[in-house]
C-alpha cells in the first residue's frame, strides 16, 4: 500500500513545507488508515488544542444571478434552479445578523455575494459591512469573486481578516466543473489577496465526480503556495436540483473524506481545516473522525447560502458528547507560530454551497 516511509513524528513542532511532490502526497493519502489518523492527530496537537473548534457563521448578502457557470452552484444564472436573484443587503441588516451570530458563539462572520467580481460601486457597502463586523469584535471574511489589486487593497484597509476563494478541485479536473474562468484566474486572485496582506480561506469540494488524485492535487496546490491558506474549507457536495453536476455527482466514501481532512492537516499544519458544507449528510461518527484527523473549524447556524446546516442544537449536542468547546479566537496555541512562514468552503460568493 504505502511504499514511501512516513517521516518520524518525534519532532515537537510541525514542519512547514511548500515543495510537496505528487508521490509524497499520494503516499500519505493512501497510507494505512490507522497510521494516517495517528500522524494527522499528532501534527494537529503540535499547534492546536484538539478539544477546541473555531466557529464561523455565514450569510449570503447577495443571492443568485451569478455570471459564472460553476456546475454545482444553485446561484449561477446559467442553471435552472428555483433560487431567485436578490440585490445586495443593506449593511445595517448584515450587522444585525452578525450580532446574532456572535451571541450564538461565532467568532468569525463570513459574508458571501454571488458575483463573478464586484463592481467598484459595490465596494462601499461591502466595506461598511466589514467595518461593522469588526466593530463587534469578530473576525470578518468575505467572498466576492475575482478582485482587482485596488479592490483587494480597499478590503485590507477596511480591516478585512479573511478572503474566501476556493480552488474547488484539481487543475486537471477544473474545466469539467467551471468553464467561465480558469484555474489560473483563481490563483491570481489568491495572490492579489495575499499581496494585500489579507488572510486566505481556500479549499474545495468533494463529490463533483473527481478522482481521489484530484483531491490530493488540490491540496498539494494549496500546500505548495508560497504562503499556506490560513483556512482550508473542505466541502461535501450537496447536489442542487437544476445544476449540471447534480446529474453526475458521485457519492463520497466517508473514509475517503476523512483521508482528505487528514492530508490537509498534515500538509498544512498551521491552517484551520474546516468542515464546511455537507455536514447534514455526515453522521456524528464521520464528523468525529474528521475532528480526530485535524478538522478544527465549522460553520454554525441552520443554513449555508443555499444548503442546510445541522443547526446550533445538533452541534451543541455533538460538542457535549465529544467534550469539544468553541475556540475563543484567535487561534493556534496562541497562533504565534503562524508568524514564522505563514503569517495562516465557502466560495460563499458565486457558489451555492458554504464553501468556506
Swiss-Prot record:
Top EC category: transferase
One GO BP annotation of this record: biotin biosynthetic process
Disulfide bonds: none
Keyword Coiled coil: no
Pfam families: BATS (PF06968), Radical_SAM (PF04055)
Protein's pathway: Cofactor biosynthesis; biotin biosynthesis; biotin from 7,8-diaminononanoate: step 2/2
Matches recorded under InterPro entries: Aldolase_TIM, BATS_dom, Biotin_synth/BioAB, Biotin_synthase, Elp3/MiaA/NifB-like_rSAM, rSAM
GO molecular function: 2 iron, 2 sulfur cluster binding; 4 iron, 4 sulfur cluster binding; biotin synthase activity; iron ion binding
Reactions accelerated catalytically: (4R,5S)-dethiobiotin + (sulfur carrier)-SH + 2 reduced [2Fe-2S]-[ferredoxin] + 2 S-adenosyl-L-methionine = (sulfur carrier)-H + biotin + 2 5'-deoxyadenosine + 2 L-methionine + 2 oxidized [2Fe-2S]-[ferredoxin]
Keywords: 2Fe-2S, 4Fe-4S, Biotin biosynthesis, Iron, Iron-sulfur, Metal-binding, S-adenosyl-L-methionine, Transferase
Residues that, per the record, bind [4Fe-4S] cluster: 66, 70, 73
Region (Disordered): 310-356
Manner of cofactor binding, per the entry note: Binds 1 [4Fe-4S] cluster. The cluster is coordinated with 3 cysteines and an exchangeable S-adenosyl-L-methionine.
Domain Radical SAM core: start-end pairs: 51-270
Compositionally biased spans, kind Basic and acidic residues: 312-350
Keyword Transcription regulation attributed: no
EC number: 2.8.1.6
Functional description taken from the UniProt entry: Catalyzes the conversion of dethiobiotin (DTB) to biotin by the insertion of a sulfur atom into dethiobiotin via a radical-based mechanism.
Subunit (UniProt): Homodimer.
HAMAP family in the cross-refs: BioB
Protein known as: Biotin synthase
Organism the protein comes from: Rhodopseudomonas palustris (strain BisB18)
